[in-house]
């Protein structure tokens, strides 16, 4: 009887999550049904950074650009991964592994890793693997980065839309902040996942093959978790400490973006010198 009750709680939790997503997505149309101009503006604000970053990544693949249809499929799978992440974070929340209310630094760490980084990056990896496992277009090292970036942008697009629609009164400010930090952050997580994914595929006999297999998930999870921990910890810190953490956060973002850019150039160089063993 107790097991049935637990299953019912989990089922109800998932139904509630789906309902919340649908409600947040439709909330704006219900509240602002008479203002189509505002509707388009909010949607454009959410999507603009995603489109710009996808275009930049697409242009980086200059040797053999990927078919646009394949990129769209990867993007849509990224949107799907947003829902798949609930299948992981839901039970962890019910089990008390993390809580949405953050009052201590430990709460921030648990929410950042178990509520966001781990379930979200695993979900992205799952759809990336499903998409690339027998994909004939995945024939260059940089392709792994391009497709993983598109998956991450699909995830970021839906997340951005939900955030802006749920903060409709301040959507422009929220949109600008997320365009500077959150969306590029997801792009960097995707770049790192794709970087190691390509190393695993194209260098199966490398001495670092096992390490690369681990790094496919470990690196994006660590980057994502540290990124979110600094953001969530603001609520728990003294005002002076908040300033220190904010400066650290800016430095972290700059180094992460620079590091991700170098990884793209590395794979582009490898593709131009095909045959070099890793």
Predicted feature residues:
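Short hydrophobic targeting helices and cationic amphipathic motifs
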Residues: 4-8, 14
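Hydrophobic alpha-helical segments at protein termini of multi-pass membrane proteins
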Residues: 28-278
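Positively charged, low-complexity intrinsically disordered regions
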Residues: 5, 24-25
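Short, positively charged and aromatic/hydrophobic N-terminal segments
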Residues: 13, 19-20, 27-34
